[in-house]
A protein has these predicted regions:
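Short, extreme N-terminal segment that most often corresponds to the first beta-strand
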Residues: 1-19
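Short, mixed-charge, low-aromatic patches
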Residues: 10-15, 56-58, 105
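Short acidic, gly/pro-rich beta-turn/loop elements at beta-sheet edges
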Residues: 14-16, 52-54, 115
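Short, intrinsically disordered low-complexity segments
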Residues: 20-91
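Acidic, proline/glycine-rich low-complexity IDRs
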Residues: 91-129
Length: 129
């Protein structure tokens, strides 16, 4: 079983979330957000055999400059609209893919404060349980 966290602000058409098994929705207040002060964060469950298709489905709908997390017990996928990085959770920020995801994020205009994937992933992983 895989899990995912998606901010619907990141999607061109957020109705795509309706095709997923939703385990939880959290509304976060982000007063400094340039997009929206309120973000709807969806926590999803995905069957292991569907993970690649579901990542691709979300990536196609994702706006530029956003990313989503998909994970199981071993790996964390950091998915952007045009590229996905597979990170070993045991190594996290020491994993080459983690560093490449940060570099890629910078190249598409994401601010460094949002590229601390470890911080955000651990927070969302805890909320999803």
């Amino acid at each position: 079983m895989y899990f995912a966290v998606i901010d619907t602000e990141s999607l061109k058409d957020p109705r795509i979330i309706n095709s997923f098994q939703i385990s939880k929705v959290v509304v976060e207040y982000e007063p400094n957000s340039e997009v929206n002060k309120y973000h709807h964060i969806f926590f999803l469950k995905i069957k292991s055999y569907e993970i690649e298709n579901k990542i691709n489905l979300i990536a196609k709908e994702m706006k530029d400059g956003w990313f989503a997390f998909f994970w199981d017990n071993q790996f964390l996928f950091i998915a952007f609209n045009k590229q996905t990085f597979k990170v070993n959770q045991a190594m996290l920020e020491k994993d080459k893919q983690y560093l490449q995801a940060q570099d890629y994020g910078r190249s598409v205009g994401i601010q460094d404060e949002f590229l601390n994937f470890k911080k955000y992933f651990k927070r969302y992983k805890k909320i999803s349980i």
